[in-house]
Amino acid sequence: MSALDATQAALAAEHAAVYGYGVVGGRIAPERRAEATAAYEAHRARREVLRRAVRDLGGAPVAAAAAYGLPFRVGDPAGAVRLAAVLEDRVAGVYSDLVRATEGPARREAAAALREAAVRAVRWRGGDVTFPGLAERA
């Protein structure tokens, strides 16, 4: 996978995560709302970084879809927490591809994004995975 393709895939994943956190925010329990808001803002910031990176690589940033399918129905706070963990796992998987496809500063940035997503996933899930970013590949 080229650096441009991997960056576009990461951008698409961030678009989906921003959408997903909109759903999470609507169902999350009040005591976890600040955590959901912080994650939403982190994904928005990463999305902007990736848009610039795509342009720097000579591409046109992939646009966000109007809506995204969710992996399951989110009808209560527990479902919102579960969705947040899934979103982070998916983003981590895409960032693991970006780490493999890039080098230098871009690789360091992708590794930092992978680490941040893995930490958020652990916080949402309450447990970790052996190899963050590879759970989606299993």
Which role does the model predict for each range below?
Residues 1-138:
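All-alpha RGS (Regulator of G-protein Signaling) helical domain and cognate RGS-like helical scaffolds
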